[in-house]
A protein has these predicted regions:
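A conserved mid-protein helix/loop that constitutes part of the nucleotide-sugar donor-binding site
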Residues: 19, 225, 232-248, 265-268
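Donor nucleotide-sugar binding/catalytic pocket of nucleotide-sugar-dependent glycosyltransferases
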Residues: 62, 132, 163-216
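Nucleotide-activated donor-binding/catalytic signature segment of Leloir-type glycosyltransferases, i.e.
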Residues: 269-288
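Short alpha-helical donor nucleotide-sugar binding micro-motif in glycosyltransferases
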Residues: 287, 295-300
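Aromatic "clamp/platform" in nucleotide-sugar-dependent glycosyltransferases that forms part
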Residues: 308
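Short hydrophobic beta-strand element within catalytic cores of glycosyltransferases
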Residues: 325-328
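A charged, aromatic-enriched C-terminal amphipathic alpha-helix characteristic of glycosyltransferases
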Residues: 367-400
Length: 401
């Protein structure tokens, strides 16, 4: 088949949105002719990577680099400006796609990035079957969980909720939903925001994925359990819940350690929260290269995720893939990743309840490590069956028939 991908963000060796675009492009190209429309600023890193990694540089993979006039790049500064810049880029990308389709006659077009249902895509104009997503953006901090936010953070959350409603009245988004042959959403929260009349063609599928499964790192009983949390240290990631859970049981179990990997504006606040344990039993790790993350996770015994509105959670997907037992608050992407593991999920009822529940699961790991090693093996097998991008593509092709 000939496939066209719209991937505004698409770069090798990157996480988040660029990694999503790249992994879908690479995997499709193993089976089909693929054209990828992406931003022109991605060109240097893509070309450099393909020159170094010749196994990815095959005749099936074609990149079309689309840019906007330099005078418009100032719009990329700030949230509102970025949305406008992205919309203008999408309009131009659609025109490029229409012209390209006249020559190549694509079997279908898929919008891959940005992974947000609240931002416009114009690929419905190409005139071939459209797959929209996986997209996200329907997630919010659960009403029952009250976290401290400054004025700026509160405004961000208010704007987010407003944009979720506004999206359903945006003409380009409505046309995309109507025209799409299939709609893939990354979370159950986003699925619930898709109008009922389109639910029969809407499927839940994590947007993120891994190219190939790493080898499982065999876990065993240890006298000094090490817990790891990873991600951006920002307010809605709620690392404070994990730290407070650790503090609840730290005195009873003096052998455990908590390690935190990530940077962000909450770092100093979190370090202060660790109190007397900072540098002794609570450690903030230095940055780890993307290609070294699996080896890094192998040093730990339990992964905790406390994010309150994440659409994907690549860090947890990587941890499960390498055989590290994971627990998480059951919201957004983490809730999807652990949907088959009720014993590892913390329901988002209230802030204090989440702290207590996470502490209880840590304690359960300490007291019943063998059980959790078995859970980790089950999670690893589940990851092998559902997290690999090839399986997502196979599912799409099967569903389209």
């Amino acid at each position: 088949m000939k496939i066209l991908l719209s991937a505004y963000a698409c770069e090798p060796n990157k996480g988040s949105e660029p990694g999503v675009g790249w992994s879908w492009a690479i995997e499709y190209a193993k089976q089909h002719q693929v054209w990828v429309i992406t931003r022109d600023n991605n060109e240097p890193s893509i070309k450099k990577y393909l020159e170094e990694k010749t196994e990815y540089n095959n005749e099936n993979l074609h990149f079309i680099y689309v840019g906007l006039p330099k005078k418009l790049t100032f719009w990329k500064k700030g949230r509102r400006g970025m949305r406008l810049f992205y919309m203008l880029w999408q309009r131009k990308a659609a025109k490029v796609a229409q012209e390209l389709n006249k020559k190549e006659h694509f079997d279908f077009v898929q919008h891959v990035t940005f992974v947000s249902y609240t931002q416009s895509s114009y690929m419905y104009k190409v005139g071939v079957p459209l797959i929209w997503g996986p997209v996200s953006g329907g997630e919010n901090i659960p009403n029952g969980i009250k976290i401290k936010m400054n004025k700026k953070e509160a405004i961000i959350e208010a704007i987010r909720k407003a944009s979720q409603t506004l999206a359903l009245y945006t003409l380009s988004i409505r046309k995309t939903m109507k025209t799409a042959k299939m709609i893939f959403v990354a979370t159950e929260e986003t699925r619930q925001r898709i109008p009922k009349k389109y639910q029969d063609k809407t499927y839940v599928m994590p947007a993120i994925g891994i190219e190939q499964m790493p080898e499982i790192i065999q876990k065993r009983q240890t006298e000094k359990p090490k817990i790891i949390m990873a991600g951006r240290l920002i307010y809605w990631k709620a690392f404070d819940i994990g730290i407070k859970a650790f503090l609840e049981i730290a005195e009873r179990y003096p052998e455990i350690e908590l390690h935190i990997l990530g940077e962000g504006n909450q770092k100093k606040k979190l370090q202060k929260l660790a109190g007397k344990y900072l540098g002794d039993r609570v450690f903030f790790e230095k940055a780890v290269q993307h290609d070294e993350i699996y080896q890094f996770y192998g040093k730990f015994d339990l992964f905790i995720n406390t994010t309150l509105r994440d659409s994907g959670c690549m860090t947890m997907m990587e941890a499960m893939s390498v055989g590290l037992p994971c627990i998480a608050i059951a919201t957004g992407g983490p809730g999807v990743l652990l949907k088959e593991f009720a014993e590892c999920r913390v329901e988002p009822t209230s802030y204090d309840d989440c702290v207590t529940a996470v502490a209880s699961l840590i304690e359960d790991y300490i007291l019943h490590t063998d059980k959790w090693i078995e859970i980790a093996e089950h999670q690893h097998r589940y990851a092998a069956e559902t997290f690999v991008v090839k399986q997502k593509i196979d599912y799409i092709q099967k569903t389209m028939r």
